[in-house]
Amino acid sequence: MAQTLTILGLESSCDDTAAAVVRQTEGQAAEILSSVVHGQADLHSAYGGVVPEIAARAHAEKLDICVRQALTEAGVSLTDLDAVAVTAGPGLIGGVMSGVMCAKGIAAATGLPLIGVNHLAGHALTPRLTDQIAYPYLMLLVSGGHCQYLIAHGPEQFSRLGGTIDDAPGEAFDKTARLLGLPQPGGPSVEGEARQGDPKRFRFPRPLLDRPDCDLSFSGLKTALMRMRDQLVGEKGGLTRQDRADLCAGFQAAVVDTLAEKTRRALTLYLDEAPAEPVVAVAGGVAANAAIRAALETVCAEAGARFTAPPLRLCTDNAAMIAYAGLERFRSGARDGLDLTARPRWPLDQSSPAMLGSGKKGAKA
């Protein structure tokens, strides 16, 4: 008889406090029974970025509320659960610790198994939650603190093909927004301005395209935009609305072109493994960018691979992905004890050397 599992997931690695309940009967599609997210944008907006101490306090205040709301919306109680899963890293350590302590409390009080989940694995496994794709698949994980190409072979088996050696794309979008006086988060703000701009007016560099590997770099792109902004301000005394839109359009075009070309290279390496049904998936907050999605769809179509991306609400940080990743670990027999520790850094591919740089979620795992 097929086993049905119901998992509570907790997420608190950056500036979103989240809880969710996911249920799956073996061999069938998983179902998100509830997904609650309490954001902190209003707490950090005055500082131009996430303040770790403020984030940690907010997580501690909101986690219990999120858990109760998630259970209520799912129509379940703690006795209906099979396990509790929690992000144990990588991330801002204060927030990760808040989530781990909350999950430990639930596990200790109820006797439920505790499952520690790598936040990046949560993103990487989201396409299996939403589209039931089979292993192995090529994953582009592109977010505020991370950017890497992975081949997913199993819930805990990932091979990294390459990644960013400095800023992640999400950081570059955020910094671009700050340079141009746009609101945070920067991704939606820059994308919105870019729709009104001319991407050909300003030609920004496409970093590392002269190298044949799958590594990326975005810090030089940010610097080039800052210099162009300063030049315009020096010449005209300020930026017009059209200047700002054209700068955003040129910046976004450079990011899109870079990701498209590096994806072609990663796809070639992935196809060398001769997967029966080649699939390319993209996840993470920056995956919500429509221009990036469209470019990746074109690259996949050219190579005869299926392209998939989760719904926008599951691209950004959420606990449904943590619950599902925990569910996959639970099915494979994984369990963690009450000695589970929070980890600020936690690479998915333990066999690869650490990436350079350190984003808002820690090292470029």
From Swiss-Prot:
Descriptive protein name: tRNA N6-adenosine threonylcarbamoyltransferase
> Is-annotated flag, keyword Cytoplasm?
yes
State the species of origin.
Ruegeria pomeroyi (strain ATCC 700808 / DSM 15171 / DSS-3)
For bias type Basic and acidic residues, the affected ranges are 192-201
Segments for region (Disordered): 184-203, 342-365
A single GO CC term, please? cytoplasm
Pfam families registered for this protein in UniProt: TsaD
Entry keyword set: Acyltransferase, Cytoplasm, Iron, Metal-binding, Transferase, tRNA processing
Q: Which family does it belong to?
A: Belongs to the KAE1 / TsaD family.
